[in-house]
Regions:
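Short beta-strand-to-loop acidic/aromatic patch adjacent to the donor-nucleotide binding site
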Residues: 99-111
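Conserved catalytic core of nucleotide-sugar-dependent glycosyltransferases
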Residues: 119-216, 220-222
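C-terminal catalytic/acceptor-binding lobe
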Residues: 31, 186-314
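N-proximal low-complexity "stem/linker" segments adjacent to membrane-targeting elements
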Residues: 1-35
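Short, acidic, metal-binding catalytic loop of nucleotide-sugar glycosyltransferases
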Residues: 34-45
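A short, glycine-/small-residue-rich helix N-cap motif at loop->alpha-helix starts
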Residues: 78-88
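A conserved acidic beta->alpha catalytic loop
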Residues: 50-63
Length: 314
């Protein structure tokens, strides 16, 4: 009898389930879905769930139109407003039904760029057989993991502006929010960063969950998400993921050659909107560029188990 050989499926055979959460940022949701449609072959996705949390009438109409345009999309409407219990309960139901699938979770204020899906699947493939790296995310400049991966680039490119990208945690650092968006919009920071051959991955022990790909390796550790307060404190899917990462000593792979853009954390949103208009962000996103992803093969685990160069110093 001839030797049996396991054939790894091509990465094109992987059809992730997309879980898109939206609640109150109507203009961000509009840009998010426009970028998805502009930069993604949505037929590559097994299914798209738009989890709509207590939307206003105009927002609801936009969500319904987006779903109607795509045969593989479903609108899941839940209330009242808030992660607990509505959104986490909806995620529990969806993820439990797709335990054997590859999942991409996306927030309404995250804007994808060309080849984002190919890069994300490629990163997933590189780590699919590593139990210690169950999550992969793009480089998101306005996020703690993204800021960590950008650290060396920022120090070399902007040595005289360290006060702009240092300081408080990113989630409440309005100076960094504004500074980063101005560099992206006016000095081609993303293009310059990608122009140099960056390390393919950076690794961190935590994540922000606005854009991430994962499978049952982490789902079996975090599901079901709590739908009540824990010890009197509010909870979230992000807290559940980070607790599992910490307790199991696991890492998140951050793509070094694929950037996606997060508009803002909630504490900085009002300030940022007064200085960086969402219309300007949309104009920028229409011209977004990225490196193409390489073609490769991947096995999905089964069962439990030169543009304008930055001036030195800005």
């Amino acid at each position: 009898m001839g030797k049996l050989t396991y054939l790894r499926p091509h990465r094109g055979d992987i059809k992730p389930v997309l879980l898109l959460l939206t609640s109150h940022r109507l203009d961000c949701f509009l840009i998010c879905t426009r970028c998805l449609e502009r930069y993604t072959d949505l037929d590559r996705l097994k299914h798209i769930y738009v989890v709509a949390n207590a939307l206003g009438s105009e927002h609801q109409a936009l969500a319904k139109r987006f779903v109607a345009r795509h045969h593989n999309a479903t609108l899941v409407e839940r209330g009242p407003r808030g992660l607990v219990p509505a959104v986490l309960a909806a995620q529990n139901e969806i993820l439990a039904a797709h335990m054997d699938d590859v999942i991409i979770k996306l927030d309404e204020d995250l804007f994808v760029t060309p080849h984002w899906l190919e890069h994300l699947i490629d990163g997933y493939c590189d780590h699919a057989e590593r139990p210690d790296v169950p999550l992969v995310m793009p480089l998101v400049p306005i996020s703690p993991p993204g800021r960590h991966v950008l650290n060396r680039f920022l120090r070399i490119s902007y040595p005289s502006e360290r006060a702009m990208y240092g300081g408080p945690p990113i989630e409440e650092n309005w100076v960094y929010h504004r500074w980063m968006w101005e560099k992206l919009l006016h000095e081609n920071l993303a293009e310059v960063y990608l122009h140099d051959l960056q390390p393919k991955y950076g690794y961190v022990g935590y994540l922000t969950i606005n854009c991430v790909i994962f499978d049952q390796r982490i789902m079996r550790l975090v599901l079901p998400f709590p739908t009540n307060r824990v010890a009197g404190q509010t909870t979230s899917d992000e807290k559940a993921f980070n607790l599992a990462l910490s307790s199991c000593k696991m890492k998140v792979a951050v793509l070094g050659r694929s950037i996606a853009h997060h508009y803002s954390f909630s504490k900085c949103e009002d300030y940022l909107r007064s200085h960086v208009s969402i219309d300007e962000v949309w104009r920028y996103m229409q011209g977004a560029s990225a490196h193409p992803a390489a073609t490769r093969q991947c096995r999905v685990p089964s069962g439990p188990s030169e543009l304008t160069l930055l001036r030195a110093g800005g």
